[in-house]
Amino acid sequence: MSKASNHKLDIDNLDFKRIYTFEEFELINEQLKTHTLKIDGNPVNLFEFNEGKLLPMPQNPISKEAVACEISRQLCNWNVHTRQNGIITASQGGFDFDISGQRTIRATDVAFIPKNIYRSLDHQQQWTFRGQSFTPTFVVEVAVVQEGNREFNDLDKKFREIYFATGSSVGLGWLVDPKNKQIYIYRRRVTGVVYRTLHGWNNVDGDSILPGFILKVQKIDDTISQESSESSSSESDETIDCPKCNATFSNDYDFMEHYEDSHARKWHKGE
């Protein structure tokens, strides 16, 4: 039994000034799966980890999480349709960014890991944080911010010093503010310098990191709009014939699901 297992941790009275071991960090996050803390009135079920310090991650309000899910949805569709066969993670998908040899666990709102990185991972890397560190190539944070305020400065520092740290594979990052309708794009110059550009609220492409991917901001607006909308996938008298096989369908949704599963989502051995 590990030393951390023998050490009684009072989840409700954590000391955020002390240095925790990595084993204690893992134990705390494991206990938080069935326990919720409140810090400054905000519910917390997950911590990040930086040089022994616990960094609370408050739960996302519904609109922020909905935006992150919509970005993930568009990214997942691109991943399937272009047969990238990579991995997309959401807001509890943590990575060890290994800053200056220090274990640094950060969870981005959305991340993409190419298939060549994922397929090279060993068992420990896949199922624990104890293997050799690896990072995604693309990260997204969703937040309501104002340039110059504390949260914006903290996120800007997170992009520059954590996500784009020396040795990180991250080549593209987006800070998405759906309320103020701004997207901040982070890239790394060939010199290694990280720079930020303001993109406004326009469709944005994935550069060479996500070839062919375009984030459509209107779909984000539609997702969090409180105006009513109706699905057009109801059954009708007309049938839809699949152009690649003999299957027929009575609604758009079933046809699209069939087309993706049977024709678009073909993962070939050896890819």
How would you label these PLM feature ranges?
Residues 1-248, 252-271:
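Gly/Pro/Ser/Thr-rich low-complexity, intrinsically disordered segments predominantly at protein N-termini
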